[in-house]
């Protein structure tokens, strides 16, 4: 698949965004089965670059993501 699309996994995870060669690649949103969500850049199925992560408590974190590492994330405060 190439271009924009949506993939629903049997686990409950959902990816909606850009695909390249059947991989998450470009801008997209990945919703985890537990309800947490990442929105941002993907590179060959891996989170890579600027993005936002919303955890299961609704806290929003933003910053640079590099596959399994996300140094210097910033918590967004809503007042």
From Swiss-Prot:
Keywords: Cytoplasmic vesicle, Differentiation, Nucleus, Repeat, Spermatogenesis. It is found in: Cytoplasmic vesicle, Secretory vesicle, Acrosome; Nucleus. MORN repeats lie at residues 15-36, 38-55. Pfam families: MORN. GO terms for biological process: cell differentiation; spermatogenesis. Its main location: cytoplasm. GO terms for cellular component: acrosomal vesicle; nucleus. It comes from the Eukaryota. Might have a role in spermatogenesis. This is MORN repeat-containing protein 2. The gene is MORN2.
